[in-house]
C-alpha cells in the first residue's frame, strides 16, 4: 500500500504583531491526489498560511493535521543558503533524513582532514552507511536527472556551481524538477511560476497535470 498524503486546516486564526487579524477561521482540506491553488491579493496571508502548514509559524487558534512526506518550495528558494551551490539548493529541499545524513558525512570529512586515525575513519564509514540507508545515493541519481532537465549538465559536473551563476528561473526550475520527481506525498509550492519564462510556465502546468 503506497503512502497517502493530506492536509487538514481547521479554524486557523493568525494575528500580526500589532494585533491585526490576518487569518480568521480558515478551514479546508486537501485530500490525496488533489491539486489546489491558493488565490488571494498581495498581503492576504497566503505565504503566512503556508508557513503555518509547514510548522514555521504557530497559529493563535485552530489546528493543522497532515500525513505523508512534506516537500516545500518557498517563495525565495535560496533564502537561508545565499552564496551556496547547486548541491546545497537541491539538498535544502530533500527529506530531513537525507539532510541529516549529509550533514553527518560533511562533519566526518572535516574531522578526517584534521585527524585521519582509525576511530575517525570508522565514524566516516558509519556516516557513509547512514547516507546510503537514508537513500542518499538514490537521491543523487534523481538530482542528476534534475540538473540535466533544467540545465543540460550532469549533477557531477554542476554540483559545485554557485547559485549566483543561475537565473531566478533556473533556480526555481531545479527545485521544481526535484520536488515533482521526489518522494514526498504533499507538496507546498509558494508562487512556483515566479521567474519562469513562458516555456517554463507551460512545462510546470503540464507536470502538475501529469502528477498523481
Task: For the regions a language model picked out, list residue spans one by one.
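ABC ATP-binding cassette signature C-motif
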Residues: 1-212
Amino acid at each position: 500500500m503506497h503512502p497517502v498524503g493530506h492536509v487538514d486546516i481547521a479554524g486557523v486564526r493568525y494575528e500580526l504583531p500589532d494585533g491585526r487579524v490576518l487569518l480568521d477561521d480558515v478551514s479546508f482540506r486537501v485530500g490525496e491526489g488533489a491539486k489546489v491553488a491558493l488565490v488571494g491579493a498581495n498581503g492576504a496571508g497566503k505565504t503566512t498560511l503556508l508557513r503555518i502548514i509547514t510548522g514555521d509559524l504557530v497559529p493563535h487558534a485552530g489546528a493543522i493535521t497532515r500525513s505523508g512526506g512534506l516537500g516545500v518550495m518557498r517563495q525565495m528558494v535560496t533564502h537561508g543558503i545565499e552564496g551556496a551551490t547547486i548541491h546545497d539548493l537541491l539538498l535544502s529541499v530533500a527529506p530531513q533524513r537525507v539532510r541529516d545524513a549529509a550533514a553527518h558525512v560533511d562533519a566526518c570529512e572535516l574531522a578526517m582532514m584534521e585527524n585521519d586515525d582509525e576511530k575517525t575513519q570508522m565514524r566516516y564509514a558509519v556516516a557513509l552507511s547512514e547516507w546510503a540507508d537514508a537513500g542518499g545515493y538514490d537521491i543523487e541519481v534523481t538530482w542528476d536527472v534534475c540538473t540535466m532537465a533544467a540545465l543540460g549538465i550532469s549533477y557531477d559536473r554542476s554540483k559545485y556551481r554557485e547559485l549566483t551563476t543561475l537565473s531566478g528561473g533556473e533556480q526555481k526550475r531545479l527545485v521544481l524538477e526535484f520536488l515533482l520527481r521526489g518522494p514526498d506525498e504533499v507538496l507546498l509550492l509558494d508562487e512556483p511560476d515566479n521567474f519562469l519564462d513562458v516555456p517554463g510556465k507551460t512545462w510546470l502546468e503540464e507536470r502538475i497535470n501529469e502528477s498523481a
